[in-house]
Amino acid sequence: MVDVIICEELKKICPEMTLGCIQAHVEVESSSDSLWKEINDYCEVLKKEMHIEELASLPRIKEGREIYKKLGKAPSKYRLSSEALIRRILQGKGVYKINNIVDINNLISLKSKFPAGSYNIENLHNPISLMIGKEDEQYKGIGKEQINMENIPLLTDSIGSFGSPTSDSERAMITSNASEILMCIYSFSGKTDIDEYLKYGKEILEKYANAKDIKIKIIK
C-alpha cells in the first residue's frame, strides 16, 4: 500500500482530518451503459431530494467549508469538489463523462458528499503527505488554468503537489494508460462512514473496472 501521512500542521487546524484510501490495479475504459445509468439515476434522486440552497449546510460539506475558513480560504470560491459536482447537477448541467475510474470516483463523491480524488500511481513519487498548501503554491487543474493552492489541504509527493479536496492536477490524472490507481476520500470529521464508502468503492471498482489486488487503508 502506498504510504500516505497527514502533516501535524494540518492536524492542528483539523484534528479530525482523515483519508480513506483504495489502491488497486484497474482497467481504464469508457464507462459502461450500466455504470452511466447508475450515475444518472442517482443524479435524478439528488434533483428530487435536494435544493441548491441546502448544499452548504450538508454536514460533510459544511465541515469542509468551516476548515477552509480556518485556513483563510473562501469556501464559495474554492469549493469542495463534492459540493461543486452536486451544484452542477442541481443546476441541470449534469456530470462530465470521462472514463470509468473518474466516473466511479464522482459517483462515490455524489453518494457520500465527501470530496474524492483518483490518481495514477505511476505518476506519484513517495513520500506522499496531506499538508497545507504553501505560499504561492499552484498547479494546473484538470480542465482548468493554474489554481492558487495556498492554504488548501494538499496531497504532495517528492515532486510537488498533485491533489486536493477542491481540484486535482493534470500530473496524476487518470487517463487510458493508467493501470494502478490511488483513490482518496477526504473527510474533515473523522472516519465515521468512511468505511461504508470504502467498501462501496471496492465493490464498484470490481464491478465496473475489473479491479484486482485491492488494498484499503484509513489514515488519520
Where are the regions a protein language model picked out?
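Charge-biased, low-complexity intrinsically disordered regions
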Residues: 1-220
